[in-house]
From Swiss-Prot:
Gene3D superfamilies: YcgL domain
Protein name as catalogued: YcgL domain-containing protein ACIAD2309
Domain YcgL: start-end pairs: 1-93
Organism ancestry: Bacteria, Pseudomonadati, Pseudomonadota, Gammaproteobacteria, Moraxellales
Lineage top rank: taxon: Bacteria
PANTHER family the UniProt entry points to: PROTEIN YCGL
InterPro entries per UniProt: YcgL-like_sf, YcgL_dom
Length: 101
């Protein structure tokens, strides 16, 4: 399964994998890469910045996510969102307030 990976403009370490099932015969130039992603995710994700194109298989290792979860999501939804790792704090982010208060 081929996919393109985009970085979020709003959240550090958030990435979106977009399925490219017809690669290399598809023509994605000029298209909105997030056109098939739900509006709520698009809003949180912000402007996508292209990072790379990958060919995924069950034997491929990914740094932070299980490739089987990514492949399943790409096949069923057409996309996979990789959230920032827990505990990741961006010092330039605005404070979110007290949690659990």
């Amino acid at each position: 399964m081929h996919c393109d990976i985009y970085r979020s403009s709003k959240k550090d370490e958030m990435y979106l994998y977009i399925a490219r099932p017809d690669y290399p015969n598809d023509d994605v130039e000029g298209q909105d890469p997030l056109e098939n992603v739900p509006e709520g995710i698009r809003t949180v994700f912000g402007k996508p910045t292209f990072v790379m194109h990958l060919e995924l298989s069950q034997s491929r290792k990914l740094a932070r996510v299980n490739v089987l979860h990514v492949l399943d999501s790409l096949q069923t939804k057409g996309f996979f969102i990789q959230m920032p790792p827990e505990g990741f704090i961006n010092p330039s982010d605005e404070p979110e307030g007290l949690r659990g208060a």
